[in-house]
Amino acid sequence: MTNNRPSNRSENGTVDRRFVLRLAAGGGVAAAGIVASSNLSRAQEASPEPDVTPAASPVPVEAVAPQFAYAGFASRPAIEAGADPATTGISVYSIDPDTGALTEIQALGSDNAFFFAFDPSERFLYVVNVIADYEGGDTGSVEAYAIDGDTGMLTFLNRQSSGGAVAAHLSVDPGGRHLVVANYNGMNFVVLPINEDGSLEPVISEVVIDGSGPNPDRQTMSHPHAVTYDPAGNFIAGADLGVDKVFIFRLNTETSELEQVSEVSTAPGAGPRHVAFNEEGTLLYVVNELNATITLYAYDSATGTIGEEIQTISTVPEPYVGTKSTAEIVIHQSGNFLYNSNRGLEGFETPEGDAIVAYTIDQETGELTLIQHQMDAIEMPENFAFDPTGTWLYAANANGISQHLIDQETGMLTFTGNLVETPKVFVILTRG
């Protein structure tokens, strides 16, 4: 059942005009919310230094614009109200065009910078802060930064409430005038208008999700975890870990409202976290955090309809011992390979549970074939990104940023020996 209602939230998390749509999402039982990432640390076995020179890759070498990487770091537990954040929450790095090595050029304070998104012009960077006590209230927050086109450095513009607790993900609409945010503990997807100068207005509308799932620890309520535009820019996929659903929304740019178009239910207890579309907009890949699988669906980008399930593949070998947990899913620029991250949460024993996992993509069907669990220099990877040329993969680990060479023929990853040691990295995004 859906109904529109005015919001009765506090001034801290809303604006004077707000549209609210509540969606029933069925199911569930159990006891309490979010599980914080453990501070697990484990020694990586030393391995011989491989030959990882860019010459091993067939990517042509040509003059390129300056390239930069942006990383966000954990500064405190996400739900620890009143904790003092660390000094540095975001770092900017230059990328060496020959070696892919990262050199820090700027560090800024930011409170638990969890995920990033560029506007379409890449002149602005938007950041969600995965917290639950913004300005003494009970919401997360969103920050806006201007990007210097020559130096890559950031200038803070402003910060707004995310309109819900524990902001987890965000996307900018193709026109660059709206920011869509998923609030993990807020049970909602929200919209913030973007001004001409890149700064953010307060939340103007939200979609609230009702429901739960069968996992008694992680699915007692809705947990929106991702918002991702399809390649045509017409529709937004919203993954909700708590209710085992992926919703498709259309953004009405005149009213700034999200309108539901379709939805699909994953396997009970799967916990959909993030999604990825193929370039043609005909396939939708969903990485499921709680059962460590990837599910592939047909997708119609003209109507925003999710079609039949084509494949479900495990990201870990069986038998598996320990807690299963996936995080990120990204398709390589070539369209030939897909990667996901497995996070080795506390108590895991199967080594492949802590890895960047590589697959080939069947160009006819979209189906995945597992080719590698890359475990060298990998420790609880929340996120990863490719450099702008698709030569390197940078993994956001609990102990720093590791650099891996991508074999352009096979998709296999090789650790380069470069590890930028940092506090726990939540996210990395590249530009250039």
Locate predicted features:
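Asp-box/WD-like beta-propeller blade repeats and closely related beta-sheet repeat scaffolds
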Residues: T155-H225
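Short glycine/acidic-enriched loop and turn motifs that connect beta-strands
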Residues: S75-I79, I131-E135, N185-M187, V243-D244, ...
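Beta-rich, blade/repeat-based domains predominating
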Residues: S110-P120, G163-P174, D210-A232, T266-G281, ...
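Short loop/turn segments immediately following beta-strands, especially the blade-tip
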Residues: S94-T99, A146-G152, P193-L200, R250-S256, ...
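N-terminal export leaders
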Residues: D16-G28
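A short beta-strand motif characteristic of beta-propeller blades
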Residues: T103-L108, F156-Q160, G213-D217, Q260-S265, ...
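N-terminal secretory signal peptides
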Residues: M1-D16, A30-I34, S38, R42
